[in-house]
Amino acid sequence: MALMVVGLSHRTASLEVLERAAFDARGAEEVLRALTASPHVEEAFVLSTCNRVELYCDVSRFHGGVADIGDVLCRRIGRGLDELGDQLYVHYEDAGVEHLFKVACGLDSMAVGESQILGQLRLALRGLHERGLAGGTLDRLLQTALRVGKRAHSETRLDAAGASLVDTAMTRAAGVVGELPGRRALVVGAGAMSALVATTLARAGLDVVVANRTPDRAQRLAAAVGGRATGLDDLRAEVAAADLVVSCTGAVGHVLDVATVASALLDRPERPLFLADLALPRDVHPDVATLRGAHLVDLEGLGADLASSAVAQDLRAVRAIVAEEVAAHAASLRAADVAPTVVALRAQARHVVEVEMRRLASRVDLDDTTRSEVDRAVHRIVEKLLHTPTVRVKELAEAPGGVGYAAALRALFDLEVTAQGGALPGDAPLSGTVADAVGHVS
């Protein structure tokens, strides 16, 4: 079996496709049932966030896995593989592990360094346990990914990169509405990202209003930042009174449509309105950007600004952590892969000793004391002969390409070992698009 990741994100797919692919907990269960019912998928978990939809699977065959997983995702989106093949990516084995670790650290997020993804990974881990897959391949991988993500946040200044998305939005806003202190900001949503936004805006001296579908959550966040809470029923009036609006909810449809914003702008014909849409699927209808007086920026625009900033230099330490952890994970897998070979070698040695001791007993009349001494001596000799090669093969197996040593040991001693891994052909690419992988099949 081998890890395979098939998915799409803000880096490969349009926002329209990402919106169609996004799903809730019920949708995730449907996708998981479809995946595990396919012939080439043993285990699976789903990662669906504001800027990615990814299926992580333990597969028995590369080509079959690509076909099965790609088919499930395409049916979910409602598009054919011929349309989506270039937007869907595939990673497997070490490349899949590296991708997951980068995701866990926030390196692959639109909001670089954001830590909300760790919560999504915990949900995926809980789902594996609820389906009775604790202790399995993906369970161990997810636990490692969570540890890597926590390590990245604790050992580096990664959290500053997450806040920089909000800083970038504020810089854009100042260019539209002027100096920010004393301005009114409307924050739509009350989740983790909304809390970061509201806190940052309040510290910058803005008047903060928090609007949310659940009044209690809006009230708690507003109280924490010294702001005011409101429900979504008053959204039109709050937009009309605001200088800037930042929306980041988990809603499936648009929270701010063209009609609502257009109506709000009528009450403020001489004042520009800045809107930052930090949600995916979009909270703000993209056509709002066409309204006179409205200045809309979304995740794509902010991400482009962030990528060119000095924050990118602060992420090198995190990338080094990821590289180190990927290497350690690969070494542990290779060491685990050689273990059955070592067990088989020792079992074969024990069998040879037992056969020869029976043969000796049938030919030579030994008393119990002598037979016991001979038996112990033979076992000590065998153990000493096997000790160095078994220790060395474990050490060598941890190095890249070390699996070849286990294969050599099996060949030299004619050992019968249940195949470990072997899901993927040697000429298959480590990463690429699903379109490339399908072409590779043909």
UniProtKB/Swiss-Prot annotation:
The record marks H99 as: Important for activity. Possesses an unusual extended V-shaped dimeric structure with each monomer consisting of three distinct domains arranged along a curved 'spinal' alpha-helix. The N-terminal catalytic domain specifically recognizes the glutamate moiety of the substrate. The second domain is the NADPH-binding domain, and the third C-terminal domain is responsible for dimerization. It catalyses: (S)-4-amino-5-oxopentanoate + tRNA(Glu) + NADP(+) = L-glutamyl-tRNA(Glu) + NADPH + H(+). One of its GO terms (molecular function) is glutamyl-tRNA reductase activity. Its EC number is 1.2.1.70. This is Glutamyl-tRNA reductase. It comes from Kineococcus radiotolerans (strain ATCC BAA-149 / DSM 14245 / SRS30216). Substrate binds at T49, C50, N51, R52, S109, E114, S115, Q116, Q120. NADP(+) binds at G189, A190, G191, A192, M193, S194. The gene is hemA. The lineage of its organism: Bacteria, Bacillati, Actinomycetota, Actinomycetes, Kineosporiales. Gene3D superfamilies: Glutamyl-tRNA reductase, N-terminal domain, NAD(P)-binding Rossmann-like Domain. PROSITE patterns: GLUTR.
